[in-house]
Curated annotation (Swiss-Prot):
<feature type="binding site">
    <location>
        <begin position="29"/>
        <end position="32"/>
    </location>
    <ligand>
        <name>ATP</name>
    </ligand>
</feature>
<dbReference type="GO" id="GO:0042026">
    <property type="term" value="P:protein refolding"/>
</dbReference>
<keyword id="KW-0143">Chaperone</keyword>
<feature type="binding site">
    <location>
        <begin position="86"/>
        <end position="90"/>
    </location>
    <ligand>
        <name>ATP</name>
    </ligand>
</feature>
<keyword id="KW-0067">ATP-binding</keyword>
<dbReference type="InterPro" id="IPR002423">
    <property type="entry name" value="Cpn60/GroEL/TCP-1"/>
</dbReference>
<feature type="binding site">
    <location>
        <position position="424"/>
    </location>
    <ligand>
        <name>ATP</name>
    </ligand>
</feature>
<keyword id="KW-0547">Nucleotide-binding</keyword>
<dbReference type="GO" id="GO:0051082">
    <property type="term" value="F:unfolded protein binding"/>
</dbReference>
<dbReference type="InterPro" id="IPR001844">
    <property type="entry name" value="Cpn60/GroEL"/>
</dbReference>
<dbReference type="GO" id="GO:0140662">
    <property type="term" value="F:ATP-dependent protein folding chaperone"/>
</dbReference>
<feature type="binding site">
    <location>
        <position position="50"/>
    </location>
    <ligand>
        <name>ATP</name>
    </ligand>
</feature>
<dbReference type="GO" id="GO:0016853">
    <property type="term" value="F:isomerase activity"/>
</dbReference>
<protein>
    <recommendedName>
        <fullName>Chaperonin GroEL</fullName>
        <ecNumber>5.6.1.7</ecNumber>
    </recommendedName>
</protein>
<dbReference type="InterPro" id="IPR027410">
    <property type="entry name" value="TCP-1-like_intermed_sf"/>
</dbReference>
<comment type="function">
    <text>Together with its co-chaperonin GroES, plays an essential role in assisting protein folding. The GroEL-GroES system forms a nano-cage that allows encapsulation of the non-native substrate proteins and provides a physical environment optimized to promote and accelerate protein folding.</text>
</comment>
<feature type="binding site">
    <location>
        <position position="504"/>
    </location>
    <ligand>
        <name>ATP</name>
    </ligand>
</feature>
Length: 553
């Protein structure tokens, strides 16, 4: 396959055209008065969204050279979404502004490498950096950052959910209930209302092995108060292995929950018969997870309940298990799909040790899937799980609302983690002085000036989307000395943004600028593009006139 190669200014202009096509589609969604983008889907109804990364991911350009530019900016949005969970549109606007100004200066004779050095130094001055020991050195943005308290959590959620107060309040309530380590999941509701459900204690998605274990026929649940808990890695099929333990438990009169890979045959039949006779209040469930993850989850349950996970590694056989090896909890509730353990009797020091261990695994893992599963395990040990059930009148609205709730949830987590700064693009404008303080000269100075201009761009775009003149608003805010003074595009007023609840998570703003500066710098220092030459499809020749039967007209 032959390739086309484009050099110098032509390569940068091709990238710029691609960047502009993508960024112009994404940036209309920015701010409280941002517009919707409708995306055609091959199956089902069109998707209506105001989420920058969703729009960016849908864009593929016909021209292969321009498409390279679009894909690189798409990377800015995706990376920002992965790290901070929000700020994708801001990152796209910044990347476009930096690259557009940079291309002009390279065309005018500036050295691209010196420009990139200036851009990198300016971004570091604003965002800060980590030194060789991994300690965080704060940047100008950190000076305006404040920790999140009380009402602010709801305000961050509201802004990220495109000014939907209901979503903001529900997310704040969920964070309050499960804490910052708790897991918040988003599901589709069967009703039109958006509701919050909180599962206290540890829950896993395995139900009872037989409906005969049910103690509350009305709710079809098995509720066992103050039970012993046997945690076993393998299948339990022979009754003789279990008998010594069951006899000891039956004497004490307390219920028993068995968590094992499976309980089948003779063992299951005997347990059911004893339950029905009233000899022993018992319930059996399958162990959660698969493979190594199952082993880890059983260990979590053991630590939470103060028991031992009977695994092959320990070398303990089921017939040799003592009462001391069993865990216990205040209550275990089992329905056909889920098991919930409330107030396990494990030692708090053991639980804290396990939590630390899982936290370090979360930091080390490179897989998003593994990280999500580890965080779920962490939440089950520490706080519990909150489920936000999103309701809407139509499926199209449901999808759009669910995406907004997920965005708002990520933004709120980021705010709790690193604090908040004044929103509406104002925090970035306040960092211009830090770039001036670098006193860079020559082409590096031009690179720093590119960042100074780009820092104003999100505010210009927010104001432009609200139907006002961006340059006037930027000038007025720049001249005002109060760092919290800014423009509330929702009400078209100049206010103290923090008091008005117009705030952004520091992490989101910082990540957006870092990623935009990184990719724009790479694109500026590009001197050649190589891509496949698109094949021209030959049109099929028209078919001849079909012959007819004799006597036909």
């Amino acid at each position: 396959m032959a390739k086309q190669i484009v050099h110098g200014e032509e390569s940068r202009q091709s990238i710029l055209r691609g960047v502009n096509v993508l960024a112009d589609a994404v940036k209309v969604t920015l701010g409280p008065k941002g517009r919707n983008v409708v995306i055609d889907k091959k199956f089902g109804s069109p998707l209506i969204t105001k989420d920058g990364v969703t729009v960016a991911k849908e864009i593929e350009l016909k021209d292969t050279l321009e498409n390279m530019g679009a894909q690189m900016v798409k990377e800015v949005a995706s990376k920002t979404s992965d790290i901070a969970g929000d700020g994708t549109t801001t990152a796209t606007v910044l990347a476009q502004a930096i690259y557009r100004e940079g291309v002009k200066n390279v065309a005018a004779g500036s050295n691209p490498m010196a420009l990139k050095r200036g851009i990198d130094k300016a971004v570091t001055a604003v965002c800060g950096y980590n030194d060789a020991e991994g300690n965080r050195i704060p940047g100008a943005l950190d000076k305006f950052s404040k920790p999140v308290t009380g009402e602010m959590i709801a305000q961050v959620g509201t802004i990220s959910a495109n000014n939907d107060e209901t979503i903001g309040k529900i997310i704040a309530e969920a964070m309050k209930k499960v804490g910052k380590d708790g897991v918040i999941t988003v599901e589709e509701s069967k009703t039109m209302e958006t509701q919050l459900e909180v599962v206290e204690g540890m829950q896993f998605d395995r139900g009872y092995l037989s409906p005969y274990f049910v103690t509350d026929p009305e709710r079809m649940e098995a509720v066992l108060e103050n039970p012993y808990i046997l945690i076993h890695e393998k299948k339990v099929s022979s009754m003789k292995d279990l008998l010594p333990l069951l006899e000891q438990i039956a004497k004490g009169g307390r219920p028993l929950v068995i968590i094992a890979e499976d309980v089948e045959g003779e063992a299951l039949a005997t347990l059911v018969v004893n339950k029905l006779r009233g000899t022993l209040n018992v319930a059996a469930v399958k162990a959660p997870g698969f493979g190594d993850r199952r082993k880890a989850m059983l260990q979590d349950i053991a630590i939470l309940t103060g028991g031992k996970a009977i695994t092959e590694d320990l070398g303990i056989k089921l017939e040799n298990v003592h009462m001391d090896d069993l865990g216990s909890a205040k209550k275990v509730t089992i329905d056909k799909d889920n098991t919930t353990i409330v107030e396990g009797k494990g030692k708090s020091s053991d639980i804290e040790g396990r939590v630390k261990e899982i936290r370090s695994q979360v930091e080390k893992t490179t897989s998003d899937y593994d990280r999500e599963k580890l965080q779920e395990r962490l939440a089950k040990l520490v706080g519990g799980v909150a489920v936000i059930k999103v309701g809407a009148a139509t499926e199209t609205e449901m999808k759009e609302k669910k995406a907004r709730v997920e965005d708002a949830m990520h933004a709120t987590r980021a705010a709790v983690e690193e604090g908040i700064v004044p929103g509406g693009g104002v925090a970035l404008i306040r960092c211009v002085e830090a770039v001036d303080a670098l006193k860079l000269t020559g082409d590096e100075g031009i690179g720093a000036n590119i960042i100074k201009r780009a820092l104003e761009e999100p505010l210009r775009q927010i104001v432009g989307n609200a139907g006002e003149e961006g340059a006037i608003v930027v000038g007025k805010i720049r001249d005002h000395k109060d760092p919290h003074y800014g423009y509330n595009a929702q009400t078209s007023e100049y206010v103290d943004l923090v008091k008005a609840g117009v705030i952004d998570p520091t992490k989101v703003t910082r990540t957006a600028l870092q990623n935009a500066g990184s990719i724009a710098g790479l694109m500026l220092t590009t001197e050649a593009l190589i891509s496949e030459i698109p094949e021209e499809k030959k049109s099929e020749p028209a078919g001849g006139h079909g012959g007819g039967m004799g006597g036909m007209y």
